[in-house]
C-alpha cells in the first residue's frame, strides 16, 4: 500500500506563494479534446498547471521537485538505488459533485512520454503489455494544501476487485506516496455541494484577486470566488525509479 507522509513542509505559506506566482490555471482536459468548442460549458472546475516538465522548471518548484523526503521514501518503497524526479503539476478543484473517474496514471516509456506522445496512445501501450520491457517504473507523491469539503482520495491498494481505502479529512500538508501507475485511484466528490457541479468552458481561468480570494473567470464572467483554502489543491510529483 502507499505511504501517508505527514507535515511534509514546515510551512505551507511557501506553497501558497508559489500558487499565486504561477497563476492562472486552466481547465483539465485539453489533451483529449483539442478541438473543443471554446464557448461550450463542457469542463468541470478542475484546473491544472505544470510546474515541472521535460523543458521547464517553474521558479520555486524545486521544493517539490528535489524534496528529500519524497526521494528517500521512494527509495525505501521501491528498494531502489536511484530516484530521478521529472514532473510536478498542480490540480485545483471545486464544485465537482461526482468527483473524478477511477484510473491509473499514464505510463512512461524509454523514448515515449506525455511530452511527445498522445495520452490515449500511452494508455494503449500500457494495457497491451507489448511494451513492458521499455516501461520506466514511476514513483508518485500527491500532496494536499488544506482540508476542504469533500475532496478525499479513494485508492485500491489490493486491486480493483477489493474495496477502496479513502484518504479524507486531516489531509492538510500530507502526501500519499506510492505507485499510481499500477494502483487505481479516484478523486472523491469535491464541494461546496450547494449548487451541484458547475461547468465552465475550455477558456476559463482560475486566478487570485487583490482581495486574497481566488476567482474563476469564464469569458469575463465571474463564475465562482472563494479563499484558496476552500479549493481542493493538490500538487503531484513524479520520478523515474531505477
Model region roles, listed by residue range:
Residues 1-80, 89-93, 97-100:
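Non-heme Fe(II)/2-oxoglutarate
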Residues 51-53, 104-110, 156-161:
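Short, surface-exposed, charged loop/turn segments at secondary-structure junctions
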Residues 57-62, 127-130, 162-164:
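Active-site rim elements
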Residues 112-114, 119-149, 177:
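Short, conserved beta-strand element in jelly-roll/cupin
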Residues 137, 148-242:
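Catalytic core of Fe(II)/2-oxoglutarate
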Residues 88-90, 141-143, 235-239:
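A structural signal for short, well-ordered beta-strand segments
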Residues 32-42, 103-105, 109-127, 194-224:
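Charged, glycine/proline-rich intrinsically disordered loops and linkers
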